[in-house]
Structures are given as C-alpha cells and as structure tokens.
Amino acid sequence: KLLRMNQLDKFKKFIEDRNENVKVGLVGAGQMGQGIIAQVSRMYGVELVCIIDRNQKQLEIAANRYKKLKNNSLLCSDSITALDNVELDILIEATGTPSAGALVAKNVLNRGINLILLNVETEATIGLALRKEAEKNGAIVTVADGDEPVAALDLYNFATELSFEVISIGKGKNNPFNRFATPSSLKKEASLKKMNPKMLTSFVDGTKTMVEMTALANFLDFNIDVDGMHGIEATYENINQYYIPKKDGGLLDNSQVVDFAFGIAPGVFAVIYSEDEYVNYEMEYLKMGEGPYWTLARPYHLTSLEIPRTIRHIMLEKYSKLSAQSWNVEVVAYAKQDIEPGTNLGSI
C-alpha cells in the first residue's frame, strides 16, 4: 500500500510518536498576530499557550478569538517577562519592531526555545547575531513563511536544484511609493485597512521593501547592484530583460543581487540563467519566454496565514529556513524633511 506522506502526514505522525502537542507562544497580537492565531488554532498537534501584547484591547480580542476555537488554558500578558514561566517549543515574534524583537529573542534563545520571526525588521538589524545566539543554545531562529524573503527563497531553491544560476531575485512593491509618507499622513488609510499607521508607513515609504531584501541578501550571500536598488517598473513577462547583466542589454553591473519592481506586486520573482543550449530550447518550448535569461515567479505571498508551514518545518526538519549567514547589506535611515538638532525622531 502506497502511503501519501506530505508535511501534514509527517507532522501528524511526529505528534503521535511524541505523544504531546507542540507548545507555541505569540508576541504581537496586531493584524499579523490575529492571522497567526486563526491558523494555529486549526493546526493538528499545536497548542497556543500564551499571547503577549502591550495593547490590552488587542490582547483581549486575540484571546477571545483563540478561546472560541480552542478550549485550552491560555496565558495573556502585556509583558514579555511572562515568558519566563512558560514552557514553549516555539515562540512567534510578530510585533514588527526591532527593539521588541531583540528583547524577545534574548529571552527565548537563551533558554533554547525556537524563534520564528514574522518581524523581518529584527532579522535585518541583528540577524547574524541572532543566528549565532541560537546555534550556541541549540535553538533555531528563522524568518517566517509568508513574508517575501522566504517566498523568494522558495524560487531560489527550486532554480538551483535544477542547476540554473540565479542572476537576480526580489519582490514586487505592493503600495504606491511615497518616500515622504508619515504615520500622520496615512492615519485615515491605515484606519480603513485596520492597520497600525506606522506599519503602513513602512510599506508606502519603501522601508519594508529595503528591510526584506536585506534579509534575503544576507541569507543568500547576495548583494545589491546600487544603493537603494533599482526599483524599476516591470512585469513578469519582461523583468528578465532588465535585471540581467549590462553586457546582455540589462541594468546590472553585478550578478547575484536582490532588487524590487513596481508592477509585479504582491509577488516575488527570480531571474535565472542557463548556458546550456538544449535546456534553453526546452524552456522556450515550455513557453517560458526567450532565453537564456528566464523568469520564475510566485504572484502572491500570504503573510501570517503561512505560519503553519514554518512551525511544521522547525519541528520536522530542525533547521532555519532563512537567517543571516553573511552581512553584505544593511538598511540606513534617510531624512524625509529638514531636521533641526535636538528633534525627537520618533520611529519612522
């Protein structure tokens, strides 16, 4: 009898052999946290045991959402010190704030608890240090499925497994670009979208894109072609004409770079290359366009809704999906207005 053994089946067997649920904690009960709660509550063999958030209203909404779906005890707190007394297999950090992410990481990695970051801001800031701390304590730290870095990484893995060379890789810019956007200017739009104005600002002003591509580059040991990246207008059909070497009519002085493009949101892309004549014939026959540069694409990423994949991966495969292995790229701040000495910069 043939057995179908996908990740769901493997995880079910893992739980049956373990005879104990995987215990998960969550820090950050905002928009992303609510999606995590909805998904974790539907996972076989996974139990959410604590939710931490400084916002009491969000904390209450999150707790009520989970308790409606699962009838187990749940610790709720507005302080990360509550984690000290909780037994966990995995902690999911979903605040989107580097300072909070760093404090949470210190708390759990020192105890050998695995850490999933739906907080790529922390990864882009101290990712290499987090990886070293995790390895020292026998834990795993990884960026979550659902964010563009891991979605793009799936394309990279697919391409390299087929012996293609990845020339460039990146994401689509989702929101209209306004480098001068602020939380106050986006307050109304954020309210309509049920988002934190600071988070929406990071999408609109380009911060999120820079942070995400930094995380991807530092894992793959890639770089950027120019400061700030090119960020061109492109489509899935023609991006392989631009993000290729200049000698072949493209924009790039370098290969193995990360970048982004307007016009392909909310997906990710990889421009790949083969020097083999027959491979290129096959790719053209398979209606992949004209080579020798080809585009692989995934036209979506499902943010917090993909968290079950990361949980299962950590418990079954026991290695990080994406965590800095080099430090080639960093993100720096760029002023949106003239700033007088002594001005409180706020956060974005």
Regions found by a protein language model. Give the residues of each.
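Beta-loop-alpha module in the N-terminal Rossmann-like domain of NAD(P)-dependent dehydrogenases
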Residues: 77-81, 86-108, 121-124
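A short hydrophobic/small-residue beta-strand
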Residues: 114-116
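Rossmann-like NAD(P)H-binding beta-loop-alpha module
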Residues: 134-135, 142-208
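N-terminal Rossmann-like dinucleotide-binding module
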Residues: 3-65
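C-terminal catalytic/substrate-binding lobe primarily of soluble NAD(P)-dependent oxidoreductases
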Residues: 3-15, 188-348
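Short gly/pro/ser/thr-enriched loop/turn and capping motifs at secondary-structure boundaries
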Residues: 57-59, 122-127, 131, 148-152, ...
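Conserved N-terminal Rossmann-fold NAD(P) cofactor-binding segment
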Residues: 55-86
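Rossmann-fold NAD(P)-binding glycine/threonine-rich loop
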Residues: 100-107, 119-139, 144-147
